[in-house]
Amino acid sequence: LQTSEIEVFQLLGLDGSTSLIALDIDAARRKLVQLPWVEDVDIRKVYPKTVEVRLKERQAFGIWQHGTELSLIEKSGSVIAPLRDNKFAALPLFVGRDAETGAAGFVAQLADWPEIRNRVRAYVRIAGRRWDLHLDNGIVVKLPEENLPQALQLLARLDLEEKVLSRDVAAVDLRLTDRTTIQLTEGAAERRQTAVDARTKALKKAEKNT
């Protein structure tokens, strides 16, 4: 449980000498459901001197980054509480405006591509319309606003056949249906340009010798 016994005791004013007769069960329930993690509560008096409290807590689905703030969210997108420690570090990270409301639905769409989903370190919402995937090796996959299954299928095929997600790639742009753009990392781009220049120089030299 994320809600501590101390929080419950303090909120209900229980100090070991509180009279059960004086305890208002309905008022106690209303107070407890105001705690950030509490979804529902069952509370009853067990005479002569016991109060039984059963809490149903909200379930954290992910971490939502909005600006500089980090919050824990439910599947519905509702904010539970600010992120305070590392115990939830394994939860998926969603970034940007409206990312929290579309998080669960979007992740569900990736269920058929676990080899991609398992490599995602952050789901970034762009302009409230589409998503970028930030992978564990720094590659950014820019997904389209529509036709998401087709884009993911293409990405999976490119990785299977060309190992595109294991190369010196900075970004894979799948936003357009008629073309895929692959942006190399700065180092890879420089090496490629050096190779092109060398080949061009060699061709010119060969032409002079003929």
Curated annotation (Swiss-Prot):
InterPro entries: Cell_div_FtsQ/DivIB_C, FtsQ, FtsQ_C_sf, POTRA, POTRA_FtsQ_type. Its main location: membrane. The chain crosses the membrane at residues 8-25. The gene is ftsQ. The keyword Cell division applies. It comes from the Bacteria. The keyword Cell division applies. One of its GO terms (cellular component) is plasma membrane. GO terms for biological process: cell septum assembly. It is found in: Cell inner membrane. Residues 1-58 form the POTRA domain. Belongs to the FtsQ/DivIB family. FtsQ subfamily. Pfam families: FtsQ_DivIB_C, POTRA_1. It is a single-pass type II membrane protein. This is Cell division protein FtsQ.
